[in-house]
């Protein structure tokens, strides 16, 4: 076989994956419809059956520390029916020795930024423009609230049956992506980017 290593197991930090193939974040049919879990289960189990060692699922949202929800998903993760749908789907995918991760993103306060920049010398176009404009600095309390939100969500996702999470730090200047940039994160407190 030309690419035999792709289908051979690999152990990373004590976790053995059945292959070296992973499935990128995808909705798999989780669209808010009545039959969404049936469609998504067929999709994800097919990916697992065809060799993926890990699938990354889009999940819904919980209210954040300010009581807001992301508009990126129609799934309310605090709904017991939604949680049960994910648990059953994960159980089916696990039958193929495939791990399941959830893609998490913060409910980004779009009116805020990781730090205020007095001068903006970057010439970004298109989709980047709305999110890269100067915005007031996000408070330290809000950052701590976001961290608490992620901890809570990770615990809940583990309880539901997920094996791990992937943090979505998008190309559109999310606070998470900005936080690790020494250019964009000019804070001088403990959340600084230096």
Model-derived segments and spans:
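Flavin-dependent oxidoreductase catalytic cores
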Residues: 1-194
């Amino acid at each position: 076989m030309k690419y035999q290593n792709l289908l051979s197991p690999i152990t990373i930090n004590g976790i053995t994956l059945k292959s070296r193939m992973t499935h990128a974040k995808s909705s798999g049919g989780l669209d808010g419809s009545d039959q969404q879990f049936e469609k998504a289960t067929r999709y994800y189990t097919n990916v697992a059956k065809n060799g993926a060692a890990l699938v990354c699922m889009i999940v819904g949202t919980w209210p954040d520390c300010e009581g807001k929800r992301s508009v990126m998903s129609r799934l309310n993760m605090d709904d017991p029916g939604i949680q049960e749908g994910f648990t059953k789907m994960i159980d089916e995918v696990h039958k193929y020795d495939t791990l399941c991760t959830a893609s998490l993103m913060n409910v980004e306060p779009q009116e805020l930024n990781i730090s205020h920049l007095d001068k903006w010398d970057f010439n970004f176009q298109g989709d980047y423009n709305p999110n890269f404009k100067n915005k007031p600095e996000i408070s330290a309390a809000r950052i701590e609230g976001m961290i608490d939100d992620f901890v809570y969500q990770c615990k809940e996702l583990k309880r539901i049956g997920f094996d791990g999470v992937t943090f979505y730090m998008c190309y559109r200047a999310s606070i998470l992506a900005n936080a690790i940039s020494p250019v964009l994160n000019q804070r001088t407190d403990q959340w600084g980017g230096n």
